[in-house]
UniProtKB/Swiss-Prot annotation:
The lineage of its organism: Eukaryota, Metazoa, Chordata, Craniata, Vertebrata. GO terms for molecular function: ATP binding. Residues 1-97 form the Pyrin domain. It is found in: Cytoplasm. It comes from Homo sapiens. Changing L84R: Increased thermal stability of the Pyrin domain. The gene is NLRP14. Changing D86V: Increased tendency to form aggregates. ATP binds at G183, A184, A185, G186, V187, G188, K189, T190. It holds the Pfam family NOD2_WH. This is NACHT, LRR and PYD domains-containing protein 14. The keyword Cell wall biogenesis/degradation does not apply. Its main location: cytoplasm. The keyword Ribosomal protein does not apply. Disulfide bonds: none annotated. GO terms for biological process: cell differentiation; regulation of inflammatory response; spermatogenesis.
Length: 1093
């Protein structure tokens, strides 16, 4: 009786206790195993009840369907399969079952035949099917001719990468749910994820992470018709459809591998609300894939997506919270090892490796195994014929021309089938259209529509230009992306006519669009564009004409030059034009005359050199840019020392080559007679590089007038710069902002300034780590120099003592300085006393900036005393952020009444408030006030002072510029100002109203003022909530020819789509009006006073 009660107690209550110990995910797993192990005699299990059951309900269901001891027997088996050994042991001890009833083996996830059958839902058959399908993973053709042990080394490296793809991020602590494996075409992405499928099926990868892994290939998916997601993932299941409910029941244990995203021919433009989450409903496959990628379908599931670098930007727009991993391919050591194993003659190997490594772009391409093999094969043929591999490796186009030609070269007496010109043109058109549309997989029907017959395709397959996919029917691809890009470039060389306005011209034939493309916006076009320029080389053309026995036209040269001229005359800034990419293309031509012609319309270039290849192409092209006047340049990484890891002798390394390229680049300073400005910034130059630069600066033919060396580290201080200042009589402007020259560096500069041969007029030393100790040297230089008129010492810790020394020079009659900036130099009221005396005695100083110093009201009083002195000739005074209050308004008002020279005053970011401004306005509207530019930005003003400001606008005929930004004027205040702006005697040309709390309510007043005022040409309205209604009101005026506004400060992206359309329409109707967010009056071309600092 006791036994009976005991056995009934545990099924009724004891089992519930154990179920309570399972977390939510473990409970779901328990239910799935329960579904799999239900005994047949019980008939259909009420799965819907089990799936929804809480723990107590589940215990009751098990009692019902497994009476007596059977419930515990099933439960213990499930606990064992879930590897919950502790629960198994505790349960067995409590119910004291004998070993015969429940043996130890029953509590483990055993491998008996019974358990294999019971756990059919674990995907055993599916795993077997995957093993059959993916057993041949590593494509031995990808590295033809290499030893097996080399192949094994690459496999081991990439296997480790696979194992850690879904590891927890050590920085964020998050486990990635979406991993994007990106890399160049052919680098091995597909091979790697197929290997992942095989390893998972064999039980050696992701076993604790994913219960099911599914492989979805882009090429196959493109050919599928409408279906459900369940049908899509069941394609590899042994039966018609897998145990889909079980699979979907725990989506967090699913991994979907989406291979070759770049080959999916889907636009992915479906709105999110239209996407599907029901895996049983049929949809177009494009909808299913979009739903999966955008986490609408099975949001808990994990994704591993492979894509080429050229389409990663397109993929990024679809994904949320993804983790990028780049597959780099063969390392430098691996490439070297491969080359040395490919060539039996080690001298040949050394020559090939050295030649490839000298071209960083080409050597980078060889990270792809197939490209490395092709390069070695091609260069080996060249060397066997006695050719110069150095020339072949000079450009990527030269090497690929050689390789493509080798595919049609007779071997062993055989004669390859050459395509006729029509066939070749059709192939090139297919390639070009594919590159433009990012189509890399072609189906038989597509090729037929594009003009390639099956006979044509077979011919190109025989020549290893095109290959048929062995697994997916009717799929064709070029043997490598670079092969497609090369034939795409050839399309433009075979095109017969380049007449303008040809109505039959297709988008991919637009050369102007191709030239304007950038690697950031259109990375898929970059290499094709390089190949196109490379094919302009006459030697390349002759080689291809011999190979294909056809005629290629160089008429495209003149067409490209026309497009370059249009770009050169456009409004694009140098940074927008992407000169580095252009130089890559021009370098491919190796045609000096063409480069000179192409660059004749570009007076200014901006390039950022951060790789050796950048230095190579820039130095080559800049020598032939004869019309250059300005070079803006940044050089990083290139000159950093590195430990060499190569078996080559050290004299073959590219250190000498880097020096030679830098020498070539710097030689432009004396070979280009038009060059006037060099802006070298944020650059790391070693001692040798700096010596080369200074040597060129001292060259007698160097005509440079303006030299900017901002944020530069000088290995040997400023001695070389100082010497250049003496030798180069053309140099008038030197900017060393952010360069850590220190007091010692300034000492050297001051010695040069005192030299009679030094003609420097402008010296900018902002943020140069200067202290009071350099001020005596500067003071002496100011007295001795007869040319220096502009000195900027901002953001240096000079303090009042340093300024005292400078003021001694300012009071000297031989000091010729006209403009001085001491912004953020640690000055106080004490420093103003010295400056005040200097202003009275100095007859030449016209511009003084004291911004960002704690002068206080006492300091302003001292400056005001100087201003009202009759001998003070100051024209511009900047007191921005000087920590004074409305009390200073009284001092300034008095001095401004007497001062006749001051025309520009900046009082921004001080606590003036309405009362202070009202005091100033009494002076500003006085007929004798000569003020032209007034800066009151951020002065804690409200609409209460706007009547006074309006009075100034009306009564001061000299006032041209007024900035009231960052004040709480609101709509009522602007309405008052607009009333004044409408008067015909208003002379305001620039008005700043940024961040003034404006809404759409003031836009009608602004519109009215813009119509009436014929002098207002610049207005800033950024950081206001004008909204769509406000833009509608402004739109009517802005598009009118009566509106004379030239620059309007507005951020288009801050408005909704409809408002943005209106602003775009304004640009069409009124092309003279520029709308931009950075409506900055302080531009170099503007003669506004503030730019002088």
């Amino acid at each position: 009786m006791a036994d009976s009660s005991s056995s009934s107690f545990f099924p009724d209550f004891g089992l519930l206790l154990y179920l309570e110990e399972l977390n939510k995910e473990e409970l779901n797993t328990f239910k799935l195993f329960l579904k799999e192990t239900m005994e047949p005699e019980h008939g259909l299990t009420p799965w819907n009840e089990v799936k929804k059951a809480r723990r107590e309900d589940l215990a009751n269901l098990m009692k019902k369907y497994y009476p007596g001891e059977k419930a515990w027997s099933v439960s213990l088996k499930i606990f064992g399969k879930m590897n919950l050994k502790d629960l198994c042991e505790r349960a067995k001890e409590e119910i004291n079952w004998s070993a015969q009833t429940i043996g130890p083996d029953d509590a483990k996830a055993g491998e008996t035949q019974e358990d294999q059958e019971a756990v059919l839902g674990d995907g055993t058959e599916y795993r077997n099917r995957i093993k059959e399908k993916f057993c041949i993973t590593w494509d031995k053709k990808s590295l033809a001719g290499k030893p097996e042990d080399f192949h094994h080394g690459i496999a081991e490296k990439d296997r480790k990468l696979l194992e850690h793809l879904f590891d927890v991020d050590v920085k964020t602590g998050a486990q990635p749910q979406i991993v994007v494996l990106q890399g160049a075409a052919g680098v091995g992405k597909t091979t790697l994820v197929r290997k992942a499928m095989l390893d998972w099926a064999e039980g050696s990868l992701y076993q604790q992470r994913f219960k099911y892994v599914f492989y979805l290939n882009g090429r196959e998916i493109n050919q599928l018709k409408e279906r459900s997601f369940a049908q899509l993932i069941s394609k590899d299941w042994p039966s018609t459809e897998g145990p889909i409910e079980e699979i979907m029941y725990q989506p967090s244990s699913l991994l979907f591998i989406i291979d070759s995203f770049d080959e999916l021919n889907f636009a992915f433009e479906e709105p999110e609300f239209a996407l599907c989450e029901d895996w049983t409903q049929e949809h177009p496959v494009s909808f299913l894939m979009s739903s999966l990628l955008r986490k609408v379908m099975l949001p808990e599931a994990s994704l591993l997506v492979t894509t080429r670098l050229t389409t990663s930007k397109r993929l990024k727009q679809l994904l949320k919270n993804h983790h990028y991993v780049e597959l780099l391919g063969m390392s430098e050591d691996a490439r070297e090892e491969y080359i040395y194993q490919f060539f039996e003659d080690k001298r040949w190997a050394m020559k090939v490796f050295s030649s490839l490594k000298s071209n960083e772009m080409l050597f980078s391409m060889c990270q792809v195994p197939l490209v490395c093999w092709a390069a070695c094969t091609c260069l080996k043929q060249q060397m066997e014929k006695g050719g110069d591999v150095t020339l072949t490796c000079q450009t990527t186009t030269a090497l690929f021309t050689c390789y493509i030609s080798s595919l049609f070269t007779p071997v062993d007496g055989g004669s390859p089938s050459l395509p006729n010109q029509a066939q070749l043109r059709r192939l090139c058109q297919v390639a070009a259209k594919g590159i433009w549309t990012m189509t890399y997989v072609f189906y038989r029907e597509n090729l037929r529509r594009l003009g390639l017959t099956q006979s044509d395709v077979s011919s190109f397959m025989d020549s290893n230009i095109i290959q048929k996919d062995a697994e997916y029917e009717n799929c064709y691809v070029f043997t490598h992306l670079h092969v497609q890009e090369f034939f795409a470039a050839m399309f433009y060389m075979l095109k017969g006519s380049w007449e303008a306005g040809n109505p039959s011209c297709q988008p991919f034939e637009d050369l102007k669009s191709l030239l304007q493309s950038t690697s950031y916006k259109d990375p898929h076009l970059t290499q094709m564009k390089c190949f196109l320029f490379g094919l302009l080389n006459e030697d390349r053309v002759k080689q291809l004409e011999r190979t294909f026995n056809c005629k290629m036209s160089l008429k495209i040269k003149s067409k490209l030059l026309q497009c370059m001229e249009v770009l050169g005359n456009s409004d694009y800034s140098p940074s927008q034009l992407g000169f580095l990419e252009l130089f890559h293309c021009l370098y491919e031509t190796q045609d000096k005359a063409f480069i000179s012609q192409a660059m004749r319309c570009f007076p200014k270039v901006a390039i950022n050199i951060c790789e050796k290849i950048h230095l190579l192409v820039s130095s080559f092209c800049l020598k032939h840019c004869r019309c250059l006047r300005t070079i803006r340049l940044s050089v990083t990484v290139v000159f950093e020392k590195k430990i060499l890891k190569t078996s080559l002798p050290t004299n073959t390394w590219d250190g000498d080559r880097i020096t030679h390229c830098w020498q070539d680049l710097c030689s432009v300073l004396h070979t280009n007679e038009h060059l006037r400005e060099l802006d070298l910034y944020h650059s790391n130059l070693d001692k040798s590089a700096m010596n080369i630069l200074h040597h060129e600066l001292r060259h007698p033919n160097c005509k440079l007038q303006k030299l900017l060396l901002k944020f530069i580290t000088f290995p040997d201080g400023c001695q070389d710069i100082s010497t250049s200042l003496i030798h180069n009589k053309n140099l008038m402007h030197l900017d060393l902002k952010g360069s850590d020259i220190g007091d010692n560096g300034v000492k050297s500069l001051c010695e040069a300034l005192k030299h009679p041969e030094c003609k420097l007029q402008t010296l900018r030393l902002e943020s140069c780590n200067l202290t009071v100790f350099c001020c005596l040297n500067i003071s002496n230089a100011l007295i001795r120099s007869q040319s220096l008129i502009f000195l900027n010492l901002s953001t240096n810790n000079l303090l009042d003592d340093g300024v005292q020394l400078l003021c001694e020079a300012l009071r000297h009659p031989k000091c010729y300085l006209e403009r001085l900036s001491l912004e953020s130099c640690g000055l106080t009221e004490a420093g103003c006393e010295y400056l005040s005396l200097a202003l009275i005695s100095n007859k030449r100083l016209t511009h003084l900036c004291l911004a960002d110093n704690v002068l206080g009201d006492g300091g302003v009083k001292l400056m005001s005393d100087a201003l009202q002195h009759a001998q003070c000739t100051l024209k511009s005074l900047v007191l921005r952020r000087c920590h004074f209050t409305s009390l200073s308004s009284e001092y300034l008002s008095t001095s401004l009444l007497h001062n006749k020279s001051l025309t520009h005053l900046d009082l921004g970011s001080n606590w003036l408030q309405d009362n202070g401004v009202k005091l100033l306005c009494d002076v500003f509207r006085h007929p004798s006030c000569n003020l032209q530019d007034l800066e009151l930005m951020g002065c804690v003003l409200t609409n209460a002072c706007c009547l006074d400001l309006a009075s100034v606008i009306l009564n001061n005929p000299n006032l041209r510029s007024l900035d009231l930004g960052n004040n709480d004027l609101q709509d009522d205040g602007v309405k008052i100002l607009c009333d004044a702006l409408r008067y015909p005697n208003c002379n305001i040309q620039r008005l700043g109203l940024e961040y003034c709390g404006l809404t759409s309510l003031c836009c009608q007043d602004l519109s009215s003022a813009l119509i009436c005022n014929k002098r207002l040409i610049k207005m800033n309205l950024t950081q206001n909530t004008l909204g769509y209604e406000g833009i509608v009101k402004l739109y009517k005026v802005l598009k009118s020819p009566k509106c004379k506004l030239q620059v309007l400060g507005l951020c288009k992206e801050a408005f909704d789509e409809e408002a943005q359309k209106l602003l775009e329409a304004v640009g069409v109707s009124n092309p003279h009006l520029i709308i931009k967010p950075d409506c900055n009056y302080h531009n170099e071309e503007d003669v506004s006073w503030w730019w002088c600092f």
